[in-house]
Amino acid sequence: MAGRSGDSDEELLKAVRIIKILYQSNPYPTPEGTRQARRNRRRRWRARQRQIHTLSERILSNFLGRPAEPVPLQLPPLERLNLDCSEDSGTSGTQQSQGTTEGVGNP
């Protein structure tokens, strides 16, 4: 892995193996039984998946030495932001707002 020492790579691979084992220990429930029983099994499975996800974040943050939350993005002041509603803007593949900029931000 780019820019990392071999020892750090081994620790990261160990963390990934631990996380893989955690996810493999919680297979999706079988589709047998009554509707209520299946629903309860899926509900418990989702709760375990949430716990595994939380544990995985903690394991990775511990091994990588940084928090799982992203660093806050620095945004420009609101006064400098504007909405461009022109149809000839060259951004293909994105939706353009059809509203007007009048009254935006005013109560």
UniProtKB/Swiss-Prot annotation:
Gene3D superfamilies recorded: 6.10.140.630
Keyword presence, Zinc: no
Modified residues (Phosphoserine): 5, 8, 92
Keyword line: AIDS, Host cytoplasm, Host nucleus, Host-virus interaction, Methylation, mRNA transport, Phosphoprotein, RNA-binding, Transport
Subcellular location: Host nucleus, Host nucleolus; Host cytoplasm
PTM annotation, UniProt: Asymmetrically arginine dimethylated at one site by host PRMT6. Methylation impairs the RNA-binding activity and export of viral RNA from the nucleus to the cytoplasm.
GO biological process, one term: mRNA transport
Region (Homomultimerization): 18-26
Biased composition, class Low complexity, residue ranges: 89-101
Major place of residence: host cell
Annotated GO CC locations: host cell cytoplasm; host cell nucleolus
Any Pfam family matching the protein: REV
Note: HIV-1 lineages are divided in three main groups, M (for Major), O (for Outlier), and N (for New, or Non-M, Non-O). The vast majority of strains found worldwide belong to the group M. Group O seems to be endemic to and largely confined to Cameroon and neighboring countries in West Central Africa, where these viruses represent a small minority of HIV-1 strains. The group N is represented by a limited number of isolates from Cameroonian persons. The group M is further subdivided in 9 clades or subtypes (A to D, F to H, J and K).
Biological role: Escorts unspliced or incompletely spliced viral pre-mRNAs (late transcripts) out of the nucleus of infected cells. These pre-mRNAs carry a recognition sequence called Rev responsive element (RRE) located in the env gene, that is not present in fully spliced viral mRNAs (early transcripts). This function is essential since most viral proteins are translated from unspliced or partially spliced pre-mRNAs which cannot exit the nucleus by the pathway used by fully processed cellular mRNAs. Rev itself is translated from a fully spliced mRNA that readily exits the nucleus.
Note on domains (UniProt): The RNA-binding motif binds to the RRE, a 240 bp stem-and-loop structure present in incompletely spliced viral pre-mRNAs. This region also contains the NLS which mediates nuclear localization via KPNB1 binding and, when the N-terminal sequence is present, nucleolar targeting. These overlapping functions prevent Rev bound to RRE from undesirable return to the nucleus. When Rev binds the RRE, the NLS becomes masked while the NES remains accessible. The leucine-rich NES mediates binding to human XPO1.
Family: Belongs to the HIV-1 REV protein family.
HAMAP family linked: REV_HIV1 (MF_04077)
Protein name (Swiss-Prot/TrEMBL): Protein Rev
